[in-house]
């Protein structure tokens, strides 16, 4: 029905793997857009120290996923980073919510993946720091 209505769809074999692939982009870009002071994704890619942090977080997500049995190729990480600057001054949904004073899905996007990574024995210190920072920034 979605495709009949013109909505592109894609069937995946494993929703958990699809979620970790989505987190490759969401964890760094949604989180750092807030933590870095409310900046758009193109700036996260253009400022060298932030671009390095984005890439490092992507690798932590990839590592955590691997500990859970999901293979996310390096090529996928590069593609996720490379498609972002052409989006322009894109503000991720978490940043939009944060700036509007709405609740940010800190637990769903950062907290739960962190806990699952840790339970699988993955060391993800950058994700730990980002999660702690976002909890403080979004506390009401």
Question: Residue locations for each model-derived region?
Answer:
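Internal alpha-helical scaffold of NAD(P)-dependent oxidoreductase catalytic cores
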Residues: 1-28, 32-74
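NAD(P)-dependent Rossmann-like dehydrogenase/reductase catalytic/cofactor-binding core
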Residues: 3, 43, 52-140
């Amino acid at each position: 029905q979605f495709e009949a209505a013109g909505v592109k769809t894609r069937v995946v074999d494993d929703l958990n793997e699809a979620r970790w692939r989505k987190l490759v982009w969401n964890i760094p870009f949604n989180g750092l857009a807030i933590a870095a002071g409310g900046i758009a994704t193109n700036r996260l890619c253009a400022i060298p120290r932030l671009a390095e942090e984005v890439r490092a977080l992507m690798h932590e997500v990839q590592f955590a996923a691997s500990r859970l049995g999901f293979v996310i190729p390096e090529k996928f990480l590069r593609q996720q980073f490379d498609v972002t600057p052409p989006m322009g001054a894109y503000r991720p949904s978490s940043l939009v919510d944060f700036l509007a004073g709405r609740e940010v899905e800190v637990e769903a996007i950062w907290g739960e993946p962190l806990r699952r990574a840790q339970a699988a024995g993955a060391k993800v210190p950058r994700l730990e720091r980002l999660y702690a920072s976002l909890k403080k920034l979004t506390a009401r």
